[in-house]
Amino acid sequence: MIKSIPSISSEVDEEKIFKIINENFSQLAPAYYTLVTHWLINAYKVHKGIDKFIILIYLINKDFIFYRKNGLIVDYDTFYKDKSLEIPKINISDIAKDLLIPKENVRRKISELEEKGIIKRRGKKIFIERSGFIQSKTNVTLNDFSILVSKFSEVLKDKKITDKSFDTEEISKSIKENFSFCWYQFYKFIFIFTNSWKAGTKTQDLETICVGLIVLINTVQNRNFKNKN
């Protein structure tokens, strides 16, 4: 329950935040690229194909969208409590368009997920088995994500945008409590990120892009790395 009315003047200025990110990206880059690279590697490990996993989380994200539309916040433990997750009707054309994956590839990968028992149909309902998006992989991403947000909170404090910074444990706890909202935002980022790489490099091969990111992360973790902008 809100105990006091929020001040309109306290609204976050997105342009100012983006400017701070751009000007201080060298401080955020190691944590940022670690998050992305670990996610892509783990996505590949689950189904031996990054696109297949992205299609899976695209379907899962439909539930997160449903929660948002209905003003619901589902915490981490509740979300992972059941063995399966009901999802809306699968639309091949929408998936292909939104993820920049050819329709035939989408159709084939969904068929493979059904053959493995990850996607199951029970009458008119469709379910995803939890084994398809292993919880341990989420724990890795949660930790990496928390480190990045914690680092960014330090930057914001240094620039006097906020009064305090938050450690990784505080961030992780908050994400778990607001899991459906936070993971909706994270998945939205993943879709934008992978689509931009596909469009920018004109390749559908996210595995090759992942190799390039590993090289990049070795660069940004170098102590001599500087922001050239």
Q: Language-model features: where?
A:
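N-terminal leader segment of winged-helix/HTH proteins
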Residues: 1-53, 158-202, 206-209, 213
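Short helix-coil-helix linker/hinge
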Residues: 46-53, 62-77, 202-210, 218-227
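Short, cationic-aromatic polyanion-contact patches
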Residues: 74-77, 91, 124-148
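A short alpha-helical element within helix-turn-helix/winged-helix DNA-binding domains
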Residues: 78-97, 113, 229
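Short helix-capping/hinge SLiMs at alpha-helix to coil transitions
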Residues: 83-86, 217-221
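Short amphipathic alpha-helical interaction segments
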Residues: 100-115
